[in-house]
A protein has these predicted regions:
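Short, acidic, metal-binding catalytic loop of nucleotide-sugar glycosyltransferases
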Residues: 1-5
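A structural signal for isolated positions on well-ordered beta-strands in alpha/beta enzyme cores
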Residues: 6-8, 148
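Acidic ATP/Mg2+-coordinating residue in the GHKL
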Residues: 11-13
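Active-site-proximal specificity loops/subdomain of glycosyltransferases
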Residues: 15-68
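A short acidic, often aromatic-flanked loop/helix-cap motif at beta-alpha or helix-coil junctions
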Residues: 36-46, 102-103, 155-163
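Conserved catalytic core of nucleotide-sugar-dependent glycosyltransferases
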Residues: 48, 78-143
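Short aromatic/hydrophobic "clamp" motif used to bind/position activated sugar donors
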Residues: 71
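C-terminal catalytic/acceptor-binding lobe
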Residues: 132-205
Length: 205
């Protein structure tokens, strides 16, 4: 990032050992860390809903009153590989990120706080819209938006080899110089050891 920023990890882990490992890494590198409350009311297998509820909580509890000019949400397996200045986009338009049909996916999501504060943000998925995490923002933040009029991220999906799919052998390259490695939590139940060796080597280049 070339624009001044504050990076905080909002940890939605259910495993205490993993959460402590994440916290230790954050403390080592001076990154903010907040452990989110457990979501005992959400059934196993509802990962998108859990993600949306977590985003709603952290926005209303921390970001809404945080004093920032902008805020952004990043998935846990997305990394910048080029210099990035979000203000280039947010000075021209009130949001930027990766479009999923009628909304911006909250794994790569940036918005001006001024406009966000005027809307009822809701990052939950929508069964009615058949949308993933963040789809409910189509009813508020992005209602009536003609996305073709905005500059947004384009995504190119790539595989390390011709074997497998993006979940066990691939990643996405974003036009703004970011990489989404996919399936870091292995919610798809794949053998991802080789993939993560490839990803680590790729990111270190």
């Amino acid at each position: 990032f070339t624009f001044p920023y504050r990076h905080t990890v909002f940890d939605n882990s259910t495993n205490d050992i993993i959460a402590n490992e994440i916290k230790t890494i954050c403390l080592k590198y001076g990154t903010g860390y907040i452990r989110l409350p457990k979501q005992d009311f959400i059934r196993v297998g509802q990962g998108s809903y859990s993600h949306g509820v977590a985003c709603n909580y952290l926005y209303k509890r921390f970001l809404q009153s945080g004093g920032g000019k902008y805020f952004g949400l990043l998935d846990h397996d997305i990394f910048p590989i080029e210099s990035f200045d979000v203000s280039i986009f947010l000075e021209k338009q009130f949001f930027y990120g990766l479009r999923h049909r009628f909304y911006i996916w909250p794994g790569f999501f940036f918005v001006r706080m001024k406009e966000a504060a005027q809307k009822n943000l809701d990052f939950r998925p929508s069964l009615w819209l058949r949308g993933d995490t963040g789809a409910c923002n189509a009813y508020s933040l992005f209602k009536g938006i003609d996305f073709v009029r905005y500059e947004l991220v384009s995504e190119e999906k790539r595989n390390f080899t011709q074997e497998g799919d993006i979940f066990d052998n691939g990643y996405s390259y974003f036009s703004c110089g970011w990489v989404h490695c996919w399936n870091a939590s292995n919610y798809m139940g794949k053998n991802i050891d080789k993939k993560w060796r490839e990803c680590s080597a790729f990111l270190k280049k």
